[in-house]
From Swiss-Prot:
Keywords: ATP-binding, Cell inner membrane, Cell membrane, Lipid transport, Membrane, Nucleotide-binding, Translocase, Transmembrane, Transmembrane helix, Transport
Protein encoded by which gene: msbA
Protein name per the record: ATP-dependent lipid A-core flippase
Keyword RNA-binding (UniProt): no
Coiled coil: none
Ranges annotated as spanning the membrane: 21-41, 65-85, 138-158, 161-181, 246-266, 271-291
One GO CC term on file: plasma membrane
Pfam family, one: ABC_tran
């Protein structure tokens, strides 16, 4: 639902509550700064009328001291407002960015399926930075220049309320212009944020896929793609600047027109004798000085609308419902009995179900394998077990006789160790990647033991920093096989009662695969193991093999019995082993 600017700004200002005292000091500084400028104009009257016109040197000799005092006061108030407002703005943006980061971490996997990484990165980095513009620069100008306008109008009315009324005629016209332009700014600001998301997404795609781009000669394609989104971003910013320039020009023409009318009225014989030289100078100076704050107030509208639009996009993410954790059952370690009952499931972004009334049972400590062609639903089962997605009745998965949704999420996910074909490593040391998410302290000896079990130590021992070696972004400094061994070491260290091996040895050479297979067999002992594999040679020793096609189990049994059936599994074996032969 589209929220009004006022609602969004109120919600944004609520973040200032923790820094209320500093914010009040900033507001006092802004008002004081404007007061010094207005007071300087007002003091021109006695200096002109009593000092110059009456040739009174006693009045004029105070002028230098007054000017110095006003400039010093102005400087003090300027520092108060600028520093305190910058402090509040940076703290609010830090809090908002931290809250957004933490909230995204707790959103369900289905949310990430529907939102691109580039767009989310843009919200965390670019949009939150735009919010600071609404809090600091915009608020500074609105309060300080707004107060200056009020003070100048007060000076004008005190000097000549009749002439000041003429100037007030333009206020409703300015208000209409600001209202119309605000809607335009808000619309363009949303387009700018969307365009920046496209720029970030295109950049992220280029950086993460640079090897494929080089390998397939796709540089020109990526250049054209980025050029389009980059130019679209430029067009939106030009629209913003054009709207800003037009609105400022119109407001300045209106103000100048009002000033011209006042000068014409003052020139009339009936008026020329009613105001003194000092009154005239104060009045004209006030009107001239009004042009600056009116221009800045018109300009700041774009910054404010840009910040409000950015805040709205951030709040839309913050209003997304976090992953539901309705479970009440706590458990340290399960036995590992898994019962999949009549499961039909489709991904939120898909129209057709991936699993169709699928049922299977995995006994505690049993090693089972899931085989089938790509897209048959094997990996979906591994996504459902840790409850990355929720099932709808009557579909149900039980763990030790208890439905998955009855377990507390943290306790449930502690029961699974996943080694996937797509290994995710963080830009940290090998040791920290192996220990990722571990809730206990670990000794160097234990860490090295795990590294040796997973055959990580073989390529680490000769490195200068050994386990403290940095792996680079997503393990770019390592080979595919080395990354997979680190993932296996991570699973060994977690020591979960249920193992999910999704093509866990697919990136390994034959020699490494044999070594890892030995480590996995030792690891799988006394654990419930689910092996998803295309290479059937890795699953021959499984207690039970389930053949899945179109989301349903079409065959099950051990390796020898399935071969004897001469069914789908037998055909797959003949095809693979025939190719290998």
């Amino acid at each position: 639902m589209d929220q009004s600017t006022t609602q969004i700004y109120k919600r944004l200002i609520s973040y200032v509550g923790a820094y209320r005292t500093v914010a009040i000091v900033a507001i006092i500084g802004m008002i004081g700064y404007s007061g010094m400028d207005a007071l300087f104009i007002q003091l021109m009257k006695p200096f002109i009328d009593e000092g110059l016109n009456e040739r009174n040197a006693d009045v004029l000799k105070y002028a230098p001291f007054v000017v110095i005092a006003l400039v010093i006061g102005r400087g003090v108030f300027n520092f108060m407002s600028s520093y305190c407002l910058s402090y509040v703005g940076s703290q609010v943006v830090r809090s908002l960015r931290q809250e957004l980061f933490e909230h995204i971490l707790h959103l369900p996997v289905s949310f990430h399926d529907k939102n691109s990484t580039g767009d989310l990165i843009s919200k965390i980095t670019f949009d939150t930075e735009q919010v600071q513009q609404a809090i600091t620069k915009a608020l500074l100008i609105v309060v300080r220049e707004g107060a200056f306008v009020v003070f100048l109008l007060a000076v004008m009315f005190y000097t000549s309320w009749q002439l000041s009324l003429i100037f007030l005629v333009i206020i409703p016209l300015v208000a209409v212009i600001v209202t119309v332009v605000s809607k335009r700014f808000r619309h363009i600001s949303k387009s700018i944020q969307s365009a920046m998301g496209q720029v970030t997404r295109s950049s992220e795609q280029m950086l993460s896929g640079h090897k494929v781009i080089h390998g397939f000669g796709g540089q020109n394609q990526e250049i054209d793609q980025f050029s389009k989104v980059n130019n679209h971003n430029r067009q939106q910013r030009i629209k913003m600047d054009a709207t800003k320039a037009l609105s400022v020009s119109i407001i300045q023409v209106l103000a100048a027109s009002a000033m011209a009318v006042i000068l014409w009225v003052v020139s009339m014989p009936s008026m020329i004798d009613t105001i003194s030289s000092g009154d005239f100078v104060v009045l004209i100076s006030s009107m001239m000085m009004l042009l600056r704050p009116l221009k800045q107030l018109a300009n700041v509208n774009s910054d404010m609308q840009r910040g409000v639009s950015a805040a709205q996009s951030v709040f839309l993410i913050l209003d997304e419902e976090v992953e539901k954790d309705t479970g009440t059952v706590s458990v340290d370690k399960v036995k590992g009995l898994i019962e999949v009952k009549n499961v039909t499931f489709k991904y939120p972004t898909k129209d057709e179900p991936v699993l169709n009334n699928l049922s299977l049972t995995i006994k505690a400590g049993e090693s089972i394998a899931l085989v089938g062609r790509s897209g048959s639903g094997k990996s979906t089962i591994s996504n459902l077990l840790p409850r990355y997605y929720d099932l709808e009745a009557p579909s149900e998965i039980l763990l030790d006789g208890i439905a998955l949704h009855d377990y507390k999420l943290t306790d449930l996910r502690r029961q699974f160790a996943l080694v996937s074909q797509q290994v995710v490593l963080f830009n940290d040391s090998i040791a920290n990647n192996i220990c990722y998410g571990l809730q206990r302290e670990i000794s160097q000896q234990e860490l090295e033991k795990v590294a040796k079990q997973a055959h990580v130590w073989e390529f680490v021992k000769d490195l200068p920093e050994q386990l403290n070696t940095m792996v680079g972004e997503n393990g770019v400094m390592l080979s595919g096989g080395q990354r997979q061994r680190i993932a296996i070491a991570r699973a060994i260290l977690k020591d979960a009662p249920i193992l999910i091996l999704d093509e866990a040895t697919s990136a390994l050479d034959t020699e490494s695969e044999k070594l890892i297979q030995q480590a996995l067999e030792a690891l799988m002992k006394d654990k419930t193991s689910i092996v998803i594999a295309h290479r059937l040679s890795t699953i021959e020793n499984s207690d039970r093999i389930y053949v899945i096609d179109n989301g349903s189990v079409i065959e099950s049994g051990d390796h020898l019995s399935l071969l004897a059936n001469n069914g789908t599994y037998s055909a797959l074996c003949k095809m693979q082993f025939g190719e290998q032969g």
